[in-house]
């Protein structure tokens, strides 16, 4: 769906309508869960599918609009700032629900959760209002980046193909935090209590946000070399988290995980901006999202299966895949530098 949405955005240049449609679907469906009955799991599933569809529709257009604005300050800074704000919202949302649950003690658990979903309509309305205001002030975001009067199809040039292979290897080896949380809760209760797990996740998200901004700034100065650094730094996290025997190694592993997550949310998108022509960039983001998502899904399934077989093997595969991405980053970077030199 992201490729279709991206190609549609490129062909029509209707970035705002596509972006707004996706946001509306995504933001309306979550508060609508408050209207689902106690046994209405089918309706809840339908709403969640619609929410995911909305996210898929909006993402290529959103990233493309950010990339246009990035031409003024730098792609790394722009996507790093986007991730910082995204993580701010990711922390603020659960905090809001925690406060609501803390003070709303009457009613059943189901009624309290329904009220929480309904309360999420407030930030949803604020978000849509801000989008409308931004749309009114900047109706043609493509003008931030002057170039390409006509649509130029995205070509599968060698540097982009090598880059996609690299990010697929990285995504395949990058474990989801849910597996980290499950492992800690099952086997590391003597190291860290279950009550601390949410705080550990919050710390990881904080590292994610800071790393995204930092690596974004570094990307604008040094280019894709920073991707190599981030891969080297984050690759050992699986050994520390799954094979470590102390709280110190666990915390260090989670910090490394946060660095890897922050890097992928800023540098990886910034590189797509620099590799794709303006007129077909949304298609490029769609291909990037599809490749990354499929690789992460397959990697999560494979590493989850290996978790029950051998932790050392699982950690080794995770680290190896992330490190195997480095040669592809370097090759892609060299080709990019050559193309700039001959441009």
Stretches with model-predicted labels:
Residues 1-14, 101, 211-223, 307:
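Helix-to-loop junctions at the C-terminal end of transmembrane segments
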Residues 24-38, 233-245:
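C-terminal ends and interior cores of transmembrane alpha-helices
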Residues 29, 40-58, 168, 249-263:
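Hydrophobic core of transmembrane alpha-helices in multi-pass small-molecule transporters
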Residues 47-88:
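Cytoplasmic helix-loop-helix junction between adjacent transmembrane helices
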Residues 114-132, 314-331:
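Symmetry-related core transmembrane helices of the 12-TM Major Facilitator Superfamily/SLC fold
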Residues 136-166:
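Juxtamembrane intracellular "pre-TM" segments in multi-pass secondary transporters
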Residues 178-197:
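Short amphipathic helix-loop junctions that connect adjacent transmembrane helices
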